[in-house]
Each structure stands twice: as C-alpha cells, then as structure tokens.
UniProtKB/Swiss-Prot annotation:
The species this protein was found in: Methanococcoides burtonii (strain DSM 6242 / NBRC 107633 / OCM 468 / ACE-M)
Name of the protein: Ketol-acid reductoisomerase (NADP(+))
Named cofactor requirement(s): Mg(2+)
Record's keyword terms, sorted: Amino-acid biosynthesis, Branched-chain amino acid biosynthesis, Magnesium, Metal-binding, NADP, Oxidoreductase
GO biological process, one term: isoleucine biosynthetic process
Residues noted as binding Mg(2+) 1 in the record, renumbered to the chain: D191, E195
Binding site residues for substrate: S252
Amino acid sequence: MVEMFYDKDADLGALKGKIIAVMGYGSQGHAQAQNLHDSGLDVVIGLREGSRRWKQAEDDGLKVMTVADAAKAADVVQILLPDEIQSKVYYSEIEPGLEAGNSLVFSHGFNIHYNQIVPSKDLDVYMVAPKSPGHLVRRTYKEGAGVPGLIAVYQDASGNALEMALAHAKGVGCTRAGVIETTFREETETDLFGEQVDLCGGVASLIKTSFEVLVEAGYQPEMAYFETLHELKLIVDLIHEGGLEKMWYSVSNTAEYGGLTVGPQIINEESREAMYVALERIQNGEFAREFVLEGQTNHAVLTSMERLEKEHPVEVVGKKLRAMMPWLNSELNEE
C-alpha cells in the first residue's frame, strides 16, 4: 500500500523565511500562489512585462515582478508555465538568477524527465502536483479542506528536499487531503498516458466515432449528441464519486448488461495493443521529441487539428443544443 503524507507529517517551518517565486499565474499558478500566501509564506509572482495577469495578481494581494527579477529575489522558484515554453524561459530568465542552495519546483515532470531542463547539481529539485484543476485547488483550500497531491524529489542538494516538498504541499493545502510520494518519471509517464489514452484522446475519439456511427446509420444528429456526449457527464460523475461499482449499481439492468457484454468488444485486444504502443512512445521519449518539435514550429499541426475539431459535426450540433441549456454556463461559472 502506498504511503500517504498528511498535515502532521509536514512542517511549514521548512519554508519560513524563504521567498517563493511562482512563475506564471494561470490555472495552477493563481491557485497555488494564493494558497501559499494564505498559509503565511512569502510569495512573489514572476510574469513577463505586459502580461494581462499582472494586474490580476496584484489585485489578489500578491507582489509581482518580471520573471528574471523574481528568480533573483527568490530562494524557491516554482515554474508553472506551459510545458513547451518552460525550457526557453528557464535558460534565458530563470537560471541566471539562481544561486547554490536554491530550490526549483515543478508541478509536472515533463521538462525534467525529458532533459529539456537540466538543473545545476547545487539546486534542490522537487515536485508538488495537486491532482485537481486550479479552481478546485483554491476553492477547497478556502473551504478549509484540500485536494490530494503528489510529491517527488529529483535532486536533493541540501539534504532537506523532501521536507521542503512536504512543506510546500502543506502550503498549497494538499496534505489536508493526503499526498503520495512518486518520482518525476512515474508522474510524467502516467500523466501523459492518462491524457492520451483516457481523459482527452481516448474519450474524445470514442465520442466522435460513436456519434458518426449513429448519424451514418440515419439517426438524428441531435439524438446522437445526447446519447454519445451529453449524458457522459452523468456517468463520469457517478464513477468519480464511487468508482465503477457505484456506476454499475446506479444504471439500469439493461445498461449494465449491455455495457458489460458489449464494452469489451469495443475496447478490445487491438485497443490494448494500441495503448501499449502509446505507452512505449511516452517511455522512450518519442512523444516528447515530437511535442518539442511541434512547439518549435509554432504549433502548426496542433492549430490545424484544433480547427478540424471545431468543425466536427458533434461540435456544430452540440453548440446549438448547449445554447438551449443556459444552466450549463451557470455550472461553469460556479467552478
């Protein structure tokens, strides 16, 4: 059984008296920075000059500097920028301001694991990764709770990197729910696999293909949308709350029998083999190299694929149907 760490296992004193620079103020940046600040820690935000987030961070009560100035001022530098720009920003603006004994913090291991960033050996390098979107990281913290998270130590120059990671996780609020110790390799490879095979790639392809099959068979696109996309949230919520067991218990006998007998015919051995191929590309660095090159071409392929996604019939139909359901916007705004 994996070991869990909680509030009692972490001491914020490991970060007291240190300046923490959070680079970026997006989904995770705004949440983690505010939580750290509200936990009594000294936080500054690093942003590029002219960033639209600058005023937002100041309005939230945080001190804002350029990335370079924040790196020079800080003892602990947390990089919460998009994966594809981290390396460039690190070498041009962050590394020149670092000193021996400083700590470098990530919430995703991509750039460390795939050697896009190779830190000096005199730095501590650790990870604090909340397993939740930023708005929930912030909301649950304000409610007195927290979201589960991961910690990992890549480099322990000081001998205190684990204590620092636990303190950082406590400041973010993750030790209230519990954190698991992992490695940069394990976090990166499992995270990418989940995104590609299940959460983003697999689900999106399943929705589009099943929608296309129904429409090609002569069913109304609106009916196909409701059955293959809209109702998915109802099922996912049940799984999220109580696992597959709660979902099977909650649906009709017809749905349970059909799902258990037909599901394995859809996601079959051929699908399993494709998953292993995807995992191998992640493990051997092939996907990382492809993604880095994609970033160097200003995301030409990604931009083209995004356009095709927007034009897919399930999106065209869905946009019209969602306009009939104003409560969906209310739910998004609440989050």
